[in-house]
């Protein structure tokens, strides 16, 4: 779904018209969030958003995976598998699954970390534990009460913020902000923008930490594209952020094309992109998430370059201490010891 432009305007007639629906949706979601979740028996760390659309959850999950391994843990990512047909529970296998099976994000992450896809998160937990998981990393699911969460980290793009502050469909919020703030343990702000400073200030009043991070382009990806004119395309939550990252890396972006988030490319669309790039002597470049979807499509031309990024935290020691503390508290609550 492509986000309506009015979601990111302070005031709009569309938002006012939809506000009653947003109030109803928000009340239902807030009530669900207050329900007691099932205790997985091992620590559960949730990486979520306050709003619909992309904000950097996937690179945050991958960064936390790396940290947890450094701490001696065996993390397994639990995903609902948005866009995939399999109900699960299933352990994602890049050799036999495509994005249409398990979703693009799980398929992409499975290259680096064990990923379980399950519509029913309790079934997913059981499979993850059978594979030796000592920590569950929930990719999304902050508003879902099914599992008890030991820590919830909320990711926000600091350039975009949370829009007009209204609840879907009047705005991008998945639930009333107050209800979501109350269940947040830390805020991850990606980039140097100020659009989410008010949210950070509200959480600071609750003694909840703010963690600044930024997306760093992979050096090999930059080198592969250096000196070339590129045709960049993306079907993610915020394609413009991808295009900005390319330009900020010194890459000559001659043409761009945006698609809806999680867009499944048809053979005709792929052929049209390739023909346009060839006609103008451009190199096709896309995100790793988009490439995960393309790998399951017919007629994908050779030469599409995936542009890799990774999340780097400004204060890694602060993040390490935060996660260590939550793991300790989670185990102390269950077992009375570390």
UniProtKB/Swiss-Prot annotation:
SUPFAM superfamilies: P-loop containing nucleoside triphosphate hydrolases
Annotated InterPro entries: LpxK (IPR003758), P-loop_NTPase (IPR027417)
Keyword ATP-binding assigned: yes
Any single Pfam family the record assigns to this protein: LpxK
The keyword Lipid biosynthesis appears for this protein: yes
Catalytic activities: a lipid A disaccharide + ATP = a lipid IVA + ADP + H(+)
GO MF annotation, one: ATP binding
Positions bound to ATP: 51-58
GO annotation, biological process: lipid A biosynthetic process; lipopolysaccharide core region biosynthetic process
Catalytic activity, EC: 2.7.1.130
Known pathway: Glycolipid biosynthesis; lipid IV(A) biosynthesis; lipid IV(A) from (3R)-3-hydroxytetradecanoyl-[acyl-carrier-protein] and UDP-N-acetyl-alpha-D-glucosamine: step 6/6
Cellular component annotations (GO), alphabetically ordered: plasma membrane
UniProt entry keywords in alphabetical sequence: ATP-binding, Kinase, Lipid A biosynthesis, Lipid biosynthesis, Lipid metabolism, Nucleotide-binding, Transferase
Principal EC category: transferase
Role noted for this protein: Transfers the gamma-phosphate of ATP to the 4'-position of a tetraacyldisaccharide 1-phosphate intermediate (termed DS-1-P) to form tetraacyldisaccharide 1,4'-bis-phosphate (lipid IVA).
Family indicated by similarity: Belongs to the LpxK family.
Protein name as catalogued: Tetraacyldisaccharide 4'-kinase
Species whose genome carries this gene: Bradyrhizobium diazoefficiens (strain JCM 10833 / BCRC 13528 / IAM 13628 / NBRC 14792 / USDA 110)
